[in-house]
Amino acid sequence: MTDAAAVLNQHLYDNWSLTSPAKDDIYWAKSKVEAVDFAKIKKNYVVACYAPMTAANVRVLAKGVLLAEQNVMVDILVKVVTSVNNAVDVRENMRNEVYRILKASTPSGFGYADVTREFNKVESPDLTRLSLQVKMVCLA
């Protein structure tokens, strides 16, 4: 089965059009990034795509076609450089860019990808974090 997290990470990178932050200013992680790890990263922005601890859901459609649904977490982390409010604004711009990319095109090999849940908004003196759950569907 396709590694949905890796495909989504590459899809977001390839289609990122924001200039602030530009895609080269972002650390593109292929696993969850904890606050302690983020402090060690030299870049001020992280987009992390990873699979949560749930298995893919496979369903049988008509004529024996298998459909696989995979959930991928997309974490957006922004370091607080000037103020929490500024970092939150940047994080929301990055969130909107993820939504724009998913609405405009589907990652290669998948027929559907959409944000199904948003949670874990964190604002602290050091960072802001937002987690998005993306459902990705493909033929298995």
What are these regions (language model features)?
Residues S83-V90:
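Short, conserved charged micro-motifs
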Residues I26, A39, V46-C49, R59, ...:
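Intrinsic disorder/low-complexity detector
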Residues G64-S83, D126-A140:
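Oligomerization/assembly interface segments of phage tail-like spikes and tubes
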